[in-house]
Amino acid sequence: MQLKNNYWIFTKAISKTNCYKIIKACLKQSKIKGTVANSKLKLRARNCYVSWISEDWIYNLLNPFIHTANRNANWNFQWDWNELSQFTEYTKNQFYEWHTDQDNKPYAADNKMINLRNKIRKLSLTLQLTDPAEYDGGDFEFKWFDVEIDLASEFQYSKQKFDDKIKTVLVKEAKELGTIIIFPSFVWHRITPITKGKRQSLVNWSIGKPFI
């Protein structure tokens, strides 16, 4: 899917007071090692700590930005539910390699969480909770094909030709405290290794019916 806008950003959208309030609420939750697809722990792909939180006031704070980005970026994706929010903490040498947030199939029809059944992640949100002066590294980066490729003729391309068409984008503004970045969940992104200090963020996914 070729997009006009691969992400939408709201710089310093959330006040410092609310950022610290979110951190305080999240630190009360149990912390575990972050996992990758299918809940497998793969330290070569991801090394960080996470906890989970579901607070109505956090959704009420963030959802208006999701609706605005969805409209202004011309995605207009159907979605009707938020997953649990994930509080993520990276310290020195921790990272999250290239990945997408969208699985290759919907949540199971018999998922114990009724609101997840038969749905996929449509939009991803990351809220920056740490002042950029408190850490080094931990950059937020995207990558995508710079031009649309005819998938029917993919086999004609060498790996080098594909690599030449991949664009990597460093989102410098994403480091600002209180900044929200929203993007389609199928877009590739990563967090580069932390070299000093600690980076904290809140991540959430808006889910809906699979694309047709």
List the predicted regions and their residue ranges.
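Non-heme Fe(II)/2-oxoglutarate
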Residues: 1-88, 93-95
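Catalytic core of non-heme Fe(II) oxygenases with the double-stranded beta-helix
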Residues: 70-212
